[in-house]
Amino acid sequence: MLNLIIATAALTALASSALAQQVAPPETESDAAHHYFHATESAHAAEWGYTGEIGPEHWADLSPDYSVARSGKQQSPIDIKSEFVKPLPKIKFHYQPAPVRMVYNGHTIEEEEEAGSSISVGETRYDLKQFHFHSPSEHTVDGKSFAMEMHLVHKTEGGQVAVVAVLIDEVDASNESFEVLLDRLPNKSTPRTESNRQIDATAVLPKDHAYFAYDGSFTTPPCTEGVKWFVLQKPIGLSKEQIDEFRKTIDGNNRPVQPRHGRAVHRSAQ
């Protein structure tokens, strides 16, 4: 009798364990672990880069976690064709001044943001987590590439990621709004910098907030999909000297454009 009770208890425990595994949500790749949300990347992540055997064409081979870089149908960046106009809601920017805290994480230069800044698109609020830079641009518009691209990375309380992309052209005049960043740019020998000065991310946006919208992915491993992209239509300008300051550290950190696979890209009205 005792043996029967023990056996029954064991079977019950096994059944409970199996049921728990069934009802628990399947483990998915958490965007919280992505370097978009952490200045220091996991020591366990597979090494990746932008050239050679660890470059973009090989990312899917570097780790099973990166397989969507090849198999995914909503990868970013893309070449944006500007023919689809749709009455999209305006992006409302609610950015607050924050201390300059910048880091070079081995792949990009990133400004870490404090809580308090956000955007709203329709009824959805996205909190600003950080912004970082690519040189040259990752997105192209009607085949045109730009000198640089800035990504302002946001996330809702529920985990939905939205990135506002700002294209950057080379122009003759310096952009004074960027001087507070350029004064403290990190580099390979000094990967983290801080300043008593503050940066208001609103100041580095174009005045016109019309945008392109599409569904895509992170542009770096693990290239997780499900990212809302808002690419501002009007570029901002930096002088050659200002762009060169960034390129001392991050020249060539752009993923090539990816197939659209039939995705619609909508353009908001001016």
Q: Which functions belong to the PLM regions below?
A:
Residues 15-17:
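N-terminal signal peptide c-region/cleavage motif recognized by signal peptidases
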